[in-house]
Amino acid sequence: ARAAVPVGVLLAVLYIFGSGAASGRTETPDPVHFAQILQEKGYETADVSLTYGRIDRNKLTQAIAGAKGGSRVECYRYADDKTVDLVYNQISYETAPDLEPRARESHETALSGGGKMFTIVADGVYYLVLFRGDTLIYACSPDSLTEINEILAETGYLRR
């Protein structure tokens, strides 16, 4: 069984998300730009397998993954927003399958401008799953989500 601990350091992330509405920016950031940022940060993006590429593959229109050390960041774009919501629910469940519904809610944040974010530390690994519009981000790291949060802010998925 996985041990689940809320990620307290993500309060800064919540601030970033919460203040995003003021920017007026509602479009989903470009996954190609996302890949460029990953490469600039030292992530390998060539021949990196997708952790969740199997889910609703027929509606997956674009996917980009990066790996560096034990950290992974993956960006999935789907044909429609409804599919993204369903995939988000499935991945957040697979990330912490033993979490009771009420406890799961404590790890989830509704994002200003639409979408949701799920964060958890399980078995010493930090996980983040978020969706906004037609795009889903899955990330994990054995160290922290600090660099991943920086990447997400720089690419527009987390808003300053």
Predicted regions and their residues:
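Gram-positive cell-envelope targeting signals
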Residues: 1-28
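Generic low-polarity alpha-helical segments
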Residues: 10-13, 73, 137, 155
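Short S/T/G/P-rich N-terminal loop/turn motif that feeds into the first structured element of a domain
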Residues: 12-17, 37, 132-133
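Second-shell loop/turn segments in exported
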Residues: 24, 71-78, 135-142
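Soluble non-cytosolic domains of exported or imported proteins
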Residues: 28-29, 81-82, 142-146
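Short, solvent-exposed recognition patches
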Residues: 32-117
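A short, solvent-exposed beta-edge/loop patch
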Residues: 104-160
